[in-house]
Every structure is written in C-alpha cells, then in structure tokens.
A protein has these predicted regions:
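Transmembrane beta-barrel strands of outer-membrane/channel proteins
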Residues: 1-7, 44-52, 88-96, 134-142, ...
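Short loop/turn motifs that connect adjacent beta-strands in outer-membrane beta-barrel proteins
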Residues: 36-41, 78-86, 125-131, 172-175, ...
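Beta-strand-dominated lipid-handling architectures at cellular/organellar boundaries
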Residues: 61, 105-108, 112-115, 121-123, ...
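Exposed, low-structure sequence patches enriched in small/polar residues
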Residues: 177-375
Length: 375
C-alpha cells in the first residue's frame, strides 16, 4: 500500500507572480500471491490505483480523477528437465478518466476502458544450448461512457482487438548468445493494421570480458489510458474530428516501433570495472507526444493535448560501472538523442535531447545499505 502527493502554491510562468493552488494525490494498493506446486507456480495478483489532481487556472477542465484496477492470474511451468516449458496468464484491466471534454457543464463525461489481456508461450529445447519459443498475446479493448455523440450517433471510441505473435530461436553457448525472431502485430477494428518488426539480438563474447553486440527490436505500444497517464497526466485526449458538436474526444492511435536497432561494445579491462558504448536508430509510427494549446477562438481555456506524428531518433551513449567486493558500487550513464519529425516538429519540444543517470551504492555492514542516485 502506498500514498503520496503534493499540495501547495506554485508560481505560474509568464505571469506577474500569479499563484496556482496545486494538488496531486496518488493512492496505490497491491496484493500478490504465489502457490508453488511440484511442477507449476500459480500466481494471483490484484492492483488498485487512484489519482486526484487539479489543473492550473483558466484550463478547460479544473480537475481530473483517474481510477484503475486490475486482476491477474497465471501459471508458470518450472520443471527444467522437461522438453517443453510453458507460461499462461489472463488479465482484466479497468481504468476510468472522469473528465473528457472541453466544457464541464455536462456532469457525466467519464470514459471507461476495459482490457482483457491473454498471454502465453511455449518453449521447446533443442539440446542444452538451443531452444525455440512461440509467444502469443491478445488484447481486447472495450470502451463505455462518453464515447459517442448522442445527437448524431458518431462513435469516437470503438472496441478493438490486437494480436501479437512472437516466434524466436535462441542459442546460448560460451561464445555466442543469439535471439532471432519477429514481432507480427495485427489489429482488428479501430486502427486496423498488419505490421511486422524484427526481434533480433546477437552477442559475441571473447577473452571472457569483451562483448560485441547488436540488436534490432520493435513492436506495438498500446496507447491505452495507463500509458497516457505515464506520459502526461495533465494531457487531454485529442479532440474528435467533427464540426457537428464541439467537446468530443477520441482515442489516440497505437504507436508502432518499426525498428530500434543498435550496436555496442562492452568491456571489463579490470576486475569489477565495466564500460559500454553504443549507438543506434529508432523509427516510430504514430509516436505519442503532447503540446500546449490555447484555443481562445474556439474554447474558453488552455490545455495540454496529446498529438501524434512519425518520428526518427538517432542516439549515442555510454555507461560505466565499478563494483568492489559488494561494499561499493558506482555507475553512470549518458545518452544523446537527435530527434526528427518531417511534418510536426513542434511535437519534439518535449523529447529529451540527453539523458543522464548516476548511482552510488555503499554496503559497509550487512545491516546497512546507503544509496544515492541522480536521474
């Protein structure tokens, strides 16, 4: 169980010291149980979340509330001597956004999202060093509430299904670690599509402490309500493309990572010391971002709204770490990004140009751990 939040006066930018009585409260509750049988683990879990917060003055909505809950049940086959291994799980995820329009005069504008997620995989061993796996995931997304224009019947949130098939081959020996597969993504209904992206990783180890690696991955990123909250809780859903009645919103399209390819080199020239340098390229279709909007000629307020465009990302980085006898650990990482958008460059304003992290862990005695970090 966890509760955290803030309540205080913040100075608004671009004003003569105007204050905002801001608050943001989060509540999280979790329960997780695992029962171990002879050859199977049964896991049952549940989660609850509640976020209450307000917007700055003169926003189109004054406050917002997110309520979420989910239930998980899964089995995990643990007999390592068996020729086949499998995992299976089912999840029920529920989420409600309470306010979803540009006019709070209507009392009930909540939108509820329900996701039924089923996942499973089967792995067959080929000797001691090789295996083949077939993984499958299906998401059924259902919407209710303020999802359509009752006057015209136009529907802006449509139920749909996504299906992910991920077959791959793995090799693991003293010199090579290979993972070769593909992500096959299908969507039915809203955002109907068929897409394929790579799922490949290769590592070559030499002299026991030097590694050359390359990887190319991708796949669908569901822009469900949970992801929207993680990206920008203050963001409003995009306005529906309708001129009949203002104030209706629609769901963003899902983001698809067509490729995220990188190459790198890891080395440990001294015991306990590791460094890693890497570079790569990422291509995102319908990349989700957000921007500030002041629609003074249409609505009576300003707001942040989610928006999308295709983006490219070139990145370079490095990291270094040192561990001394489980007493001292130091690590640092830096990544530089060069983002590009062909049509909506203003959406890149919230993209990170660089990311840096630094962590120190001190374990002087068995009963004491000291951690210091910066991100």
């Amino acid at each position: 169980f966890q509760m955290d939040g803030m309540d205080g006066k913040l100075t608004l930018p671009f004003t003569d010291g105007e204050k905002w009585n801001a608050f943001y409260y989060r509540t999280r509750a979790n329960v997780d149980y695992t029962h171990q049988f002879d050859q199977l683990d049964l896991n049952i879990a549940g989660n609850f979340g509640l976020s209450n917060f307000n917007f700055q003055p003169e926003s189109v909505n004054s406050k917002q509330k997110f309520t979420s809950g989910d239930f998980h049940a899964g089995i995990h086959f643990i007999d390592e001597t068996a020729p086949l291994h499998f995992n299976a799980e089912t999840n029920l995820l529920m989420y409600e956004r309470q306010h979803n329009m540009f006019n709070e005069s209507e009392a009930n504008t909540g939108i509820k999202e329900t996701i039924i997620r089923t996942k499973g995989d089967v792995t067959g061993a080929i000797g001691d060093q090789q295996s083949i796996t077939i993984a499958l995931e299906m998401n059924n997304l259902l919407y209710s509430g303020y999802t359509k224009n009752v006057s015209t019947g136009d529907e802006y949130f449509k139920n749909y299904t996504t299906l992910l098939l991920n077959p791959y081959y793995e090799l693991d020996n003293d010199d090579w670690k290979l993972h070769i597969g593909a992500n096959v993504d299908l969507s039915f209904g809203f955002d109907k599509s068929f897409r394929i992206s790579p799922d490949i990783t290769a590592q070559y180890i030499f002299s026991d402490s030097y590694i050359v690696y390359a990887k190319a991955t991708g796949g669908k990123q569901l822009n469900d309500f949970r992801r929207l909250e993680n990206i920008c809780p203050y963001g409003e859903l995009p306005e529906a493309n309708t001129t009949a009645t203002l104030g209706y919103v629609q769901r963003p399209y899902d983001t698809y990572e067509q490729i995220n390819g990188s190459i790198g080199f890891k080395a440990s020239p001294y015991p306990g010391l590791w460094f890693n340098v890497f570079g790569g390229y990422q291509n995102l279709k319908n990349d989700l971002s957000y921007l500030g909007f002041d629609p003074s000629n249409i609505h009576s307020g300003s707001y942040l709204t989610f928006a999308q465009d295709n983006t490219d990302n070139l990145y370079l980085g490095g990291e270094i770490s040192y561990d001394y006898k489980d007493i001292l650990g130091i690590s640092a990482k830096y990544t530089y990004h060069n983002w590009d958008s062909k049509t909506e460059e203003y959406l890149l304003a919230v993209k990170p140009v660089s990311e840096m992290s630094f962590n120190v862990r001190i374990h002087p005695i068995s009963a004491l751990n000291i951690n210091l970090g910066y991100d």
